[in-house]
């Protein structure tokens, strides 16, 4: 493998994540806060949020010490993904075009992994409640408060979407944006009970 290119990719990924946090601080704050109690949000944070950024940053800043383990893990993942039994081909053409394609597909399939799969283990995601803050170069601060209303015995109904509009464009806008001088505010409630307020 090309170690220099791998380090460049990590640096580029780190930079892109930093930029996305600056441009989407409200959703970043909401996702991170939801990850304290929601396994689904924790997975999303670990694969595309602050949790993911922390892993990428650690790998990029300590590349020399971590590169062997990273390369071994990437190879293991590649063996699990790029397999003959995972290959699905969708092809549209006349019957005449199929024969040359079958030959090309066979060549591709021959390059894929066929060794026995490792036994699958269930993925357990453990949420940890935290009270944390993150510093960026932005002069805008984002604050999020999240929770699960179904866990508190409140069912999801369409009325929550009306509440979202009222909160976001009336109450929160007037009290947080206009009176308080905040940059903006938003709220959301979904069908699995997750709700958040962000300013």
Segments predicted by a language model, with ranges:
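Glycine-rich, charged/polar anion/phosphate-binding loops
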Residues: 73-75, 127-133, 183-184
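An aromatic/glycine/proline-enriched structural segment found at the starts
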Residues: 88-144, 149
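A short linear-motif detector with a strong N-terminal bias
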Residues: 66-70, 113, 121-126, 162-166, ...
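Non-catalytic, conformational "gating/processing" segments within enzyme and secreted inhibitor domains
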Residues: 44, 49, 71-105
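Aromatic-residue-lined binding/catalytic grooves and analogous aromatic/hydrophobic interfacial grooves
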Residues: 59-71, 75-77
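Short amphipathic C-terminal alpha-helix that caps PH/PH-like domains
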Residues: 1, 105-109, 163
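M16 family metallopeptidases and their MPP-like homologs
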Residues: 1-64, 84-93, 142-162, 168, ...
